[in-house]
Regions:
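Structured beta-strand/turn binding interfaces of compact recognition modules in eukaryotic regulators
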Residues: 27, 63-66, 92-94, 102, ...
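Conserved phosphate-binding catalytic cores of ATP/NTP-utilizing and phosphoryl-transfer enzymes
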Residues: 72-74, 86-110, 126
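Conserved, well-structured core segments
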Residues: 60-63, 99-100, 179
Length: 186
């Protein structure tokens, strides 16, 4: 999400197209919502513009990180029921869904996102809570490290602003970096 001023904002493709001249703000930091007003705008954009749905007619499932604070879950539920008038809501942990997506109910899930990496042992679809671990390290940290390396070498990537440079490095990272399944062969 990009915020120009308090009354004008861009989300999604419009934000990407104008990223060189806009200030970028993410309402989620290290897996936790920090800006509820903008999260509400994002959900409105998703439900109305992207999905073209009638929220009153559909239950919603929301994924959440391992250690999502209960107060955040309650606040999000309040927004969904009171603002969007949804009939039902289900929260599920991303680690469990990641394992389900691979067709398994028992295993070990590693989920590395923008600001968090989470480790979760799962047995028959249930989290084994004594083994849960979360590290505040993710893709944004790798982007910042690559950006620092470029700055330390005197590189300037964008004539516009530092935010745009970060997005350029993020694009390079996403197109060039990968996780190998056969480390020894590489």
């Amino acid at each position: 999400m990009k915020v120009v001023n308090k009354t004008e904002f861009f989300i999604g493709d419009k934000a990407k197209k104008n990223r060189g001249v806009l200030n970028y703000f993410n309402p989620i930091k290290r897996g936790t919502i920090i800006d509820w007003d903008n999260i509400e705008k994002i959900y409105k954009f998703i439900l109305d513009d992207e999905l073209r749905s009638k929220p009153k007619e559909h239950n919603i499932m929301i994924t959440e990180p391992l250690m999502n604070p209960r107060k955040n879950r309650e606040k999000l539920a309040q927004i969904m029921f009171e603002t969007f008038n949804i009939p039902g809501l289900f929260f599920e942990n991303t680690a469990v869904l990641n394992l389900f997506a691979s067709g398994k109910f028992t295993g070990f899930s590693v989920d590395s996102g923008e600001g968090l990496t989470q480790y979760a042992p799962i047995f028959e679809g249930y989290l084994l809570t004594p083994g849960l671990m979360q590290v505040e390290f993710g893709g944004e940290d790798i982007t910042n490290f690559l950006l620092k390396m470029l700055f330390d070498n005197g590189e300037k990537l964008s004539p516009y602003n530092d935010n745009n440079e970060k997005k350029i490095v993020e694009d390079i990272k996403e197109k060039s970096c990968y996780v190998t399944l056969k480390f020894e062969d590489e």
